[in-house]
Regions:
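FAD-site-proximal beta/loop scaffold in flavoenzymes
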Residues: 5-14, 99, 118-165
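Rossmann-like NAD(P)H-binding beta-loop-alpha module
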Residues: 2, 11-58
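A Rossmann-like FAD-binding core segment of flavoenzymes
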Residues: 42-130, 134-140
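Catalytic cores of large soluble enzymes that bind and process phosphate-bearing ligands
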Residues: 2, 26-33, 83, 95, ...
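Phosphate-coordination loops involved in phosphoryl transfer and adenosine-cofactor binding
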Residues: 21-24, 88, 97, 154
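Flexible, glycine/proline-enriched loop segments at strand-loop-helix junctions
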Residues: 23-28, 32, 61-63, 116-119, ...
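Short, ordered loop/turn segments at secondary-structure junctions
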Residues: 1, 9, 53-56, 90, ...
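A generic local secondary-structure boundary/capping motif
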Residues: 15-17, 37-41, 92, 109-110, ...
Length: 165
């Protein structure tokens, strides 16, 4: 259904010039990418109505409790807070005739219909660091540490993409 994208996809489209000013957006799924995608949309003039986090509050609290180990990420998380953030929530249905017009959200077990122009979904995007770790690359802030040229801590070993944060 046009108007429905991945959360990372919407973020990339916006950074590539997609105009979203004035659009009503719902972001749904799991993980910190939801907050980053919502912030990108909002910074570009979109009205982010809800961030529907699939994880329960206990899981979100467990994740948040780990953030003080990485002060930079803790500060970033604080700047990404959104009043429409709801844990224990998920999309039940995307509604529209030829284009997205609304979504049905389950928020804490209660169904709510939200009129919107875009839905961005992302579920459990976690960078895979296994190869870099196995090779002995230095890890910083849950990512492979790289310099400005994408070189890792190992000579002649480079990394790019999500694994580098």
């Amino acid at each position: 259904l046009p108007g429905v994208t991945g959360a990372g996809g919407l973020q990339a489209l916006i950074k590539g010039g997609l105009p979203v000013a004035g659009e009503r957006i719902v972001v749904a799924g799991s993980g910190p990418l939801l907050l980053a995608s919502a912030a990108t949309a909002q910074d570009n003039g979109a009205q982010v109505l809800n961030i529907a986090e699939q994880a329960h509050w206990s899981a979100v609290a467990g994740f948040a409790a780990q953030l003080p180990r990485w002060p930079g990420k803790l500060l970033q998380a604080c700047t990404l807070f959104h009043p429409g953030y709801r844990a224990n929530s998920h999309v039940v249905e995307a509604l529209g005739d030829g284009r997205l017009q609304a979504v049905r959200l389950s928020i804490g077990g209660r169904i709510r219909k939200v009129a919107c122009d875009r839905l961005a979904c992302g579920f459990g995007l976690i960078a895979n660091l296994q190869l870099g770790q196995a090779l002995g690359c230095r890890i910083e802030l849950n990512a492979l540490a790289v310099d400005d040229w994408q070189a890792t801590s190992l000579a002649d070993h480079y990394a790019a993409g999500e694994s580098t944060g």
